[in-house]
Amino acid sequence: MQASQFSAQVLDWYDKYGRKTLPWQIDKTPYKVWLSEVMLQQTQVATVIPYFERFMARFPTVTDLANAPLDEVLHLWTGLGYYARARNLHKAAQQVATLHGGKFPETFEEVAALPGVGRSTAGAILSLSLGKHFPILDGNVKRVLARCYAVSGWPGKKEEIGRAHV
């Protein structure tokens, strides 16, 4: 299957069945997309929505998150699990505040350098909020690609991921 055919089929599917009204999809900003992407790691959408809404109500900007005590961030995160994500969010927000003047970085290298942000998350932030063209290789994307292109082995293996990022 040609890449153009594949992308057309995926976009058609998204037009018919995709979610388009999630809280982080409305008025997309790098901060909102980043927050949602981190919360969605290993966590279902339905679980994330109320946490995302609470975080946005309490920390409407990355600077607000950076200036909050870590204990408050962890308290709002309670129940979401994988607390390293919350600690990394806080550290990354502090870096954005100090190194970038509170403006979320807009280059792949700068975003990927933030604590807790890997290549896929950096790609998602820049693609979904700014329309830049970077791959997003989360578990769902890897499964779809593996099925469509008959990838042998688990698509989460490092060598498969490396090929996909080429």
Q: For each of these PLM feature ranges, what is it?
A:
Residues 2-4, 9-165:
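Catalytic cores of DNA base-excision repair glycosylases
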